[in-house]
């Protein structure tokens, strides 16, 4: 804890040194505008968790309980206006740390905007992600406790197989994508076509089309297979949305949860009830077909023998969300259901349904904001409960030091073994960091 307090002191001193007005840089002339924006996060995390074995206790390669985390984004938006038509491009650069992939930055894409709406070509963020409302949108801090917790450690496994858990409110089009774990991958999320209507009497709608969630726009080997002459049932070596699990007797299950012909849509409504009260509502959804089948195979030396293939169910997911603000108080809530999306009974024997709900309340007074959030997820009957208390202080516009403490509990077992005992792990994560946005 002394080390955590020391790190907090260093962060506060660094924040104070940056405390001066720093508006977003904008270069413009009569019809062309260039906007530069960026984000950087430095965070120190401390975790205490039970039932961790050997190196599972390490937050980093050589340190237990304590670790640093950084995240960054930098983007340039160039727009030109001619006869009430705005056309331009947004270019997001790859930083030398983990890239921030939130919908606020939305990745590199071309856009065209008129009075009839906005079209985005090649955007990595779909309409459901941009229009979705969750309770965490009103909170302080980052909600990043899951970066330091280990929910699928050795204690939680059975026959070497990990349990599946969800630690946030996300849909498949977002969660099954390249995660920038390697900064040299030079790949983003799948590319999409988006259309958003203009806001009319508080309403706005959006729709997206994604031909293939494995097509990130920069990758070349779209259909690279490891099995010769295996056709559509082959095992793709792409990392995007694919995992292979080892079973008994040298058998494996390769689960490709990529989607083809994926559609997502959303509808939001904003209403100013009074001078001090605002209400925002949102309904979003996703639909798509599985790109490939689940493959049951057996390893015989260097040879792979396909024993059987199984059809995965279609992607069908929706989210309902609301945010209410009254004066300095804000509260948000959401419920999401993914049903049996992209599962098959031959592997998901414990359960196939996934859902989540979360709620948060926040109070802001001047530069200080404090929030309390609760998250509940259930993925294939494996549950996660988390409560987070966070506070942040705005030193200047865009500069936010914060502190956050979260308590979590995960309970479950591997989906392939219904006979496995259900195990539980609990822990507490403390975060201290600084966010800088310009």
UniProtKB/Swiss-Prot annotation:
SUPFAM superfamilies: Porins
Key word Signal present: yes
Pfam families reported for this sequence: Porin_4
Molecular function terms from GO: porin activity
Protein name: Uncharacterized protein RC0098
Signal peptide boundaries: 1-19
InterPro entries documented for this protein: Gram_neg_porin_domain, Porin_dom_sf
